[in-house]
């Protein structure tokens, strides 16, 4: 009889240790993988000085970026431009989504000094637009919403002219309570990712619920009708184009005005494999459909991620 897997608090579990406890066993690390097409190859910048500067600044203040923790393919480009997406509430997620490279485990309690550290780091970096996201914190009574609110408050106090976008989890089972905490310090853009299509949620987003996510986006929009709401999707996980179009329509029906759509990339052999690589022309077609549906801004392209050039997205610029 095998010994049950026991996690230690504060320890990051990745790759096989993470995926071994996912309910749906659908990952074979030895399977053949699709060859990456030419359009998915990234040219790295010649200099890494700016990249190291941002990494060192994060370490100095004990902060995390989702760019590093989730192994984002755009890290070099964004860091080289002096931008980063800050990840609050630690670097250990209570969920274990098999598409995501963020570590799973039992997280430590929130750092009460993190809001001030975040505000000071943003001030040091002289940012005009910032994205703040977090891991899922299903272990907290408010799922981390109060900490989000405190971070927004601290950042605004020290950086009065900044624009703030928050990319939030689904606040599992606590949507109403979470929004009550967020309403005291609302962002300039409210972002929550649906990720993919409801048919694949059990496989892709164990612990999440498509209806909860739509409810969160809808109720925030009802509370703050003048604040843009935004959501992101990945393609290449086994969905059909028709299913993606239906999700896009569901987003519009729930008041979402900004969309990001990008190619899923497998972080390691212990994550879900890429089912197909979507060519750039199809992303252009998705963007055209999004415009027809009434999205005010749609960033669609192979390397587009939820916070990729978020400042340009918010100002209405073309991102692809």
UniProtKB/Swiss-Prot annotation:
Residues at which [4Fe-4S] cluster 1 binds: 67, 72, 78, 307
Signal sequence bounds: none
Cofactor(s) the protein requires to work: [4Fe-4S] cluster
Catalytic activity: [[Fe-S] cluster scaffold protein carrying a second [4Fe-4S](2+) cluster] + N(6)-octanoyl-L-lysyl-[protein] + 2 oxidized [2Fe-2S]-[ferredoxin] + 2 S-adenosyl-L-methionine + 4 H(+) = [[Fe-S] cluster scaffold protein] + N(6)-[(R)-dihydrolipoyl]-L-lysyl-[protein] + 4 Fe(3+) + 2 hydrogen sulfide + 2 5'-deoxyadenosine + 2 L-methionine + 2 reduced [2Fe-2S]-[ferredoxin]
Keywords annotated in UniProt: 4Fe-4S, Cytoplasm, Iron, Iron-sulfur, Metal-binding, S-adenosyl-L-methionine, Transferase
Family: Belongs to the radical SAM superfamily. Lipoyl synthase family.
Name of the featured protein: Lipoyl synthase
Organism: Haemophilus influenzae (strain PittEE)
Origin organism lineage: Bacteria, Pseudomonadati, Pseudomonadota, Gammaproteobacteria, Pasteurellales
